[in-house]
Amino acid sequence: IASCLVGSEMCIRDSSNTVRLYNNGLISLQQFCAKEGIGTQVALNEGIVTFKKDSNHYTIPQAVAMMKPRRVVMTFGTNDTGMEVSDFIAHYTALIQAIQQSYPYTDIIVNTVPPVPADHSNYPHMDQARIDDFNMALLEMCEQLGVRFLNSAEALKGSDGYGIADYYTSGDIHLKSVGLKAVLNYIRTHACQTDDRRPDTNNIP
């Protein structure tokens, strides 16, 4: 992915953990579109992206067309674990296809849903087995759609199959700075080498 994690070349789509990447100074504002608590359905249909000197709100597919990133890394699913796997994949597929239609020149990389630590008492409804099911379904979806799959979950998982406790806030599912750095390092060291297909990079907000 991230041999090109520079400037406007990569854009990260996510919810709360990507907000934390920005808040911890690990990525720039030009590199992400994120909002805490969103799932795939909201990401497709709601205007959650804004730009400076522009009062309009844009959906993620619309924003991708405006930002013209070389690559898009998508990390959704934490806020979707209450739905059936088939519904999650249907929403995710629709989101990917909307981005492809809006801006066909970007390489889409689908990242795994992050694991949760064994102690996630603040979020008792979260289920690691469901997350594993989501990630297996995401791999199959990527193969069917011809987009890339990134298994960053392996950088966060311990030998017990849960997230490494030191990477998470106690009793929580959100990553601390050390966990965020582990994810970002994984993205950077699992580079995807492709040609830059963008016709131009002009007029990026």
Please provide the spans of the model-predicted regions.
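Solvent-exposed loop/turn segments at secondary-structure junctions
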Residues: 16-20, 37-41, 78-83, 114-118, ...
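Structural recognition of the beta-strand scaffold that forms the well-ordered cores
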Residues: 13, 31-34, 70-76, 107-112, ...
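Catalytic His-Asp segment of secreted/periplasmic serine-dependent ester chemistry enzymes
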Residues: 116-205
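Generic structural signal for well-ordered alpha-helices
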Residues: 92-97, 135
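Oxyanion-hole/transition-state-stabilizing segment in secreted/luminal serine hydrolases
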Residues: 54-89, 114-119
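Active-site segments of SGNH/GDSL-like serine hydrolases
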Residues: 75, 79, 97-132, 154
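Acidic/histidine-rich helix-loop elements
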Residues: 26-55, 82, 172
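Single conserved hydrophobic/aromatic residue that forms the stacking wall/gate
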Residues: 1-7, 11-12
